[in-house]
Regions:
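Acidic-enriched, low-complexity/disordered segments with a strong bias for Aspartate over Glutamate
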Residues: 32-35, 53-56, 71, 86, ...
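Cys/His-rich short segments
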Residues: 66-135
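N-terminal alpha-helical interaction blocks
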Residues: 1-69
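Short, charged low-complexity intrinsically disordered segments located at boundaries
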Residues: 38-43, 52-63, 76, 88-96, ...
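Long, charge-rich boundary regions
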Residues: 108-178
Length: 178
């Protein structure tokens, strides 16, 4: 996919403030990756996968977020299942004394060192992905892209669907507010 001129201009600015290797890897990601890989990107995992310096990658993603390439989110995680209990644009959004996990049905007191991750999602102004409209995702894709954190290593689609079929007795999709 060829990036629009406006996005190319943002990458020109990013090249001025971040190291070239991470910027090139991010540009390739935005151009070539499927939608799912552009939702909740973990900078540390990205660095490891591409053999890049963690600090350089973190810097590139932070600068990219400031330039509007990514939306940065602070995710509160369930330590038991890895689900995202809450998400906000700043650390100040961690205000509750307890967060309840809908999957585990347990309350958790937030601890910043164990329950918070920072992720980056492509901005809809740069490239629109399915996760920008979570209400349109099937329940399976919703859990894969929205509910579980970047640290949950899920299998390929076929294996995942088979596993869900074998372990799920019934499912019902509810419209928002139901």
């Amino acid at each position: 996919m060829k990036l629009p001129t406006e996005t190319e201009n943002v990458f020109s600015a990013l090249r001025q403030s971040a190291k070239p290797k991470p910027v090139s890897a991010i540009e390739k990601l935005i151009e070539d990756a499927p939608d799912r890989e552009l939702c909740r990107i973990n900078a540390l995992a990205f660095a490891a996968r591409h053999g890049l310096d963690e600090d350089d990658v973190i810097g590139a993603f932070l600068h990219g977020a400031r330039l509007g390439l990514f939306d940065m989110s602070w995710n509160i995680l369930c330590p038991a299942c890895g689900g995202i209990l809450d998400s906000g644009a700043t650390l100040k959004t961690v205000r509750q004394a307890e967060y309840r996990c809908v999957l585990c049905a347990r309350g958790r007191e937030p601890t910043l060192d164990e329950m918070v991750e920072v992720t980056f999602t492509i901005s809809p102004r740069v490239r629109r992905i399915a996760a920008h409209d979570p209400g349109t995702l099937s329940w399976l894709e919703y859990y894969r892209q929205i509910f579980w954190s970047s640290g949950v290593d899920l299998p390929d689609d076929e294996t995942f669907a088979k596993w869900v079929k074998e372990t799920t007795l019934d499912s019902r999709e509810l419209l928002p507010g139901e």
